[in-house]
Amino acid sequence: MAAFRDMEEVSQGLLSLLGANRAEAQQRRLLGRHEQKVERLLETQDGAEKWLREILTTEKEVAQRLLDAKEQAHQGGVEVRQLEAELQRASEEDAHLKANLLQLTRELEELKEIEADLERQEKEVDEDTTVTIPSAVYVAQLYRRISKIEWDYECEPGMIKGIHHGPSVAQPIHLDSTQLSKKFISDYLWNLVDTEW
C-alpha cells in the first residue's frame, strides 16, 4: 500500500514537471488515467483486506466450532465408554445374581427333598414306635423268658456275647460268628435252653 502512495507522489511530481512541455495535455490525460487506476487498485486492495479480515474471522469461528464439536464428540465418546463399562458391570452382576439364584434354587430343592425324606423317616419312626418296636420288645422279652439269655448288645461286630442264666449257675456266652457256622451257633444256644418248663 505504501508503494502505491509513492507511485502517486511520483506521478504528481511528473505532472508538474511535464506541465511546461507541449505534450503536457496528453501526459496529464495519461497521468489522470494512471491515477484512476491507482485509486481503483487502492480501493480494491482495501476491499480485499476487508474481505480477508472477514474470512479470517469466519475461519476462526468455524475452527472454534469444530474444536467445540470435537470436544463434545470426545465427551460423548467418554460417556459412551462409561455407559458401556456400567452396562458390562451390570451384566456381570446380573450373571452373578442369576448363578446365585440357581444355586439357591438347587439348595431349596435339596432341602425340600431332605424335608420329604425326614417326613418319611418320621412316619417310619412313628410306625416303629407304635407298631414295630412294641412288638419287637414283646418278642425280645418272650425270647429272654424262654431262653434266659441276657444279650450284650454293645459287643464288637461279629461277636455274640451275653449271659445265660441257667437253673443252677449263670454262664457267659462268647462266640465268634466269623469262625463258627450259623448252625453251630444256633444249636449251641438252643442246647442252653432248659426243656423243663
UniProtKB/Swiss-Prot annotation:
Disulfide bridge positions per record: none
Location in or out of the cell: Nucleus; Chromosome, Centromere, Kinetochore
Keywords from the named record: Cell cycle, Cell division, Centromere, Chromosome, Coiled coil, Kinetochore, Mitosis, Nucleus, Phosphoprotein
Top-rank taxon, per record: Eukaryota
GO CC field: Ndc80 complex; nucleus
Residue ranges that the Swiss-Prot or TrEMBL entry lists as coiled coil: 21-131
Residue span of region Interaction with the C-terminus of SPBC25: 132-197
InterPro entries documented for this protein: Ndc80_Spc24 (IPR013252)
Ranges where the record places region Interaction with the NDC80-CDCA1 subcomplex: 1-69
Any single biological process term in GO: chromosome segregation
Modified residues (Phosphoserine): 11
Alphabetized CDD domains for the sequence: RWD_Spc24 (cd11565)
Region described as Interaction with the N-terminus of SPBC25: 1-131
Keyword hit for Phosphoprotein: yes
Protein family according to the UniProt entry: Belongs to the SPC24 family.
Described function: Acts as a component of the essential kinetochore-associated NDC80 complex, which is required for chromosome segregation and spindle checkpoint activity. Required for kinetochore integrity and the organization of stable microtubule binding sites in the outer plate of the kinetochore. The NDC80 complex synergistically enhances the affinity of the SKA1 complex for microtubules and may allow the NDC80 complex to track depolymerizing microtubules.
Subunit structure and binding partners: Component of the NDC80 complex, which consists of NDC80/HEC1, CDCA1, SPBC24 and SPBC25. The NDC80 complex is formed by two subcomplexes composed of NDC80/HEC1-CDCA1 and SPBC24-SPBC25. Each subcomplex is formed by parallel interactions through the coiled-coil domains of individual subunits. Formation of a tetrameric complex is mediated by interactions between the C-terminal regions of both subunits of the NDC80/HEC1-CDCA1 subcomplex and the N-terminal regions of both subunits of the SPBC24-SPBC25 complex.
Listed PANTHER family: KINETOCHORE PROTEIN SPC24, PTHR22142
Protein name, entry field: Kinetochore protein Spc24
Annotated organism of origin: Bos taurus (Bovine)
